[in-house]
Amino acid sequence: GLCTEDNIAMTPYSALASGRLSRKEGYTRRATEDDYARGKYDSTAEQDRSIIERVAELAERHLVSMTEISLAWLLTKVTSPVVGATKKAHVDGAVNAVNLQLSPEEIQFLEETYQPHVLTGIMAQNTPQTKDVKQVWMR
């Protein structure tokens, strides 16, 4: 890609898709309370389901958390992800991911069902047309 070709460092935020790549599907308090995350990810829930299932499968195979698998994959693509942590276990998962090596076959397994999403969140809302609109992060 462009970043690799031009030696541009990339540091993505929301590395775990607001927690969706850190646990199997199901009820969470955040899922019911975080309107912003739902707005970003609910429309792609069906297409993302197979990836989440594959992350869970590899986590079981490696005997690690889904967080570790997700971040280990991301670390093969970027300089450093921005990882939010509200609990010690979140930090532990991020640290452990640094030492987890996924095989090329495992990386392919995670990527083969991916379908690109339309731009969403802050980047999609940060346009000249919406510069004066009150956004969720301005509350």
Language-model segments: which ranges?
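Short secondary-structure transition/capping segments
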Residues: S22-G26, P81, A94-V95
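Hydrophobic, secondary-structure "cap" segments at the distal end of domains
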Residues: A72-W73
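Terminal-tail/helix-coil boundary detector
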Residues: E5, R29-E57, R61, T76, ...
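Aromatic-lined glycan-binding groove of carbohydrate-active enzymes
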Residues: G1-E33, S65
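Glycine/threonine-rich phosphate-binding loop and adjacent beta-strand/alpha-helix elements that clamp
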Residues: I69
